[in-house]
A protein has these predicted regions:
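PLP-dependent aminotransferase class I/II
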Residues: 211-289, 293-296
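Short, conserved charged micro-motifs
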Residues: 47-48, 310-317, 348-351
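Conserved PLP-binding catalytic core of the aspartate aminotransferase-like
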Residues: 277, 290-322
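Conserved core of the PLP fold type I
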Residues: 60-183, 194-209, 213
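PLP-dependent enzyme catalytic core of the Aspartate aminotransferase-like
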Residues: 321-322, 331-366
């Protein structure tokens, strides 16, 4: 069976190893495995789940959802202050990125991304047959606007930027994003998966600039990674273009209900975000006191740190043996010998600090 020639050199996406497999490997009960590698919330969306339990008998799961997702767009309008015609509802933010590449990219076109950053920009663009041009970030992980603009050619159709950036946690000033959009004159997709943790957003740029598309999710701050709800924000004329390729029923009625329930209780989300930010700052200080690592500033719900003495992969393995699963980035360009950890509850963060201190002490003894 022959597949598209384009895919002949592709490798399967590196999905996270299931917790059951990790537990079997390290000899621990699966209940003791703590995922600090996915940047998901340690909090359950309690009030949304309570609303769902009360309404289960009334949800028409035997019917297709309203394909315009009008009710959810109304709630997002209230949350963002933007008009109903400004939204594209998606099955998670990744579907939003996929829609953008389908609308703007032809085979042979070019896309500009920075490095290091979220890998799906490269993957989604490559699937469309585009050539991905990578502009390295500076040593402090800030973007180089001049180099990005210099990389734009007549073949360039899109620029993808994550803000705050994954996996580095830094924030790009809105003025830099505005300049990129105005001077590049190509589609500028700004991924704001983590914006609630910093309180700063480029969404207002999409009020005036037709080429700005903001991509968001309810996975992180709203504690709904498993629900798979994302949305794009753009000018109405851009939304019309994006809706041309949007699947009509990719979001389930259960997911739609939970999304609306979460948006109906924003105080719960904001409280969880405040707790996470407080824990993040505590964790930055505590990790910064550990010899042998350097911790980078973050405006997200995760931290990136570099192992100075020893091998980050060995530290990663030792932590996994204690049931703490971090993201190993040690072989990723720009973040060599680095690990990334999700900010969790005080109890889990205490456990992480203690385990990391032991792992680094063992490393210095080798």
């Amino acid at each position: 069976m022959k597949i598209r020639e384009l895919f002949s050199g592709f490798e399967e996406y590196g999905w996270e190893t299931p917790s059951e497999e990790i537990a079997a490997k390290v000899g621990l009960p699966v209940e003791e495995i703590v995922r600090l590698d996915t940047n998901t919330s340690p909090f359950r969306p309690v009030r949304a789940l309570e609303d769902l339990a009360s309404a289960l008998d009334t949800i028409e799961v035997n019917q297709y959802p309203d394909t315009s997702y009008l009710s959810l767009r109304e709630d997002l309008a209230g949350y963002t202050g933007k008009g109903l015609d400004r939204f594209v509802i998606t099955n998670g933010a990744d579907e939003g990125l996929d829609i953008i590449t389908k609308v703007f990219l032809d085979p042979g076109d070019e896309v500009v991304i920075t490095a290091p950053t979220y890998s799906m920009y490269r993957i989604a663009s490559s699937i469309m047959g585009a050539r991905v041009v990578t502009v390295p970030r500076r040593k402090d992980f800030s973007i180089d606007v001049e180099k990005i603009l210099a990389s734009v050619t007549p073949k360039t159709k899109a620029i993808f930027l994550c803000n705050p950036n994954n996996p580095t946690g830094d924030f790009t000033p809105i003025a830099d994003l505005e300049r990129l959009a105005e001077e590049s004159r190509v589609a500028v997709a700004i991924d704001e998966a983590y914006f609630e943790f910093c309180g700063k957003s480029a969404v207002d740029l999409s009020d005036e600039l037709e080429n700005v598309i903001v991509c968001r999710t309810l996975s992180k701050a709203f504690s709904m990674a498993g629900v798979r709800i994302g949305y794009l924000v753009a000018k109405p004329e851009t939304v019309k273009k994006l809706n041309v390729v949007r699947p009509p029923n990719s979001v389930s009625v259960i997911s739609l209900f939970l999304a609306q329930a979460a948006l109906a209780h924003p105080d719960e989300m904001r409280g969880n975000v405040r707790s996470t930010v407080e824990e993040r700052e505590k964790l930055v200080r505590r990790l910064g006191e550990i010899r042998g690592i350097v911790v980078y500033p973050s405006e997200t719900n995760f931290l990136l740190f570099r192992v100075l003495d020893g091998d980050a992969s060995a530290v990663h393995g030792e932590l996994m043996g204690k049931g703490l699963v971090l993201r190993n980035l040690s072989r990723v360009q720009g973040v060599e010998n680095c690990l990334r950890c999700t900010v969790s509850t005080p109890e889990i963060n205490d456990r992480l600090v203690a385990a990391l201190e032991r792992a680094l002490a063992h490393g210095s003894e080798r």
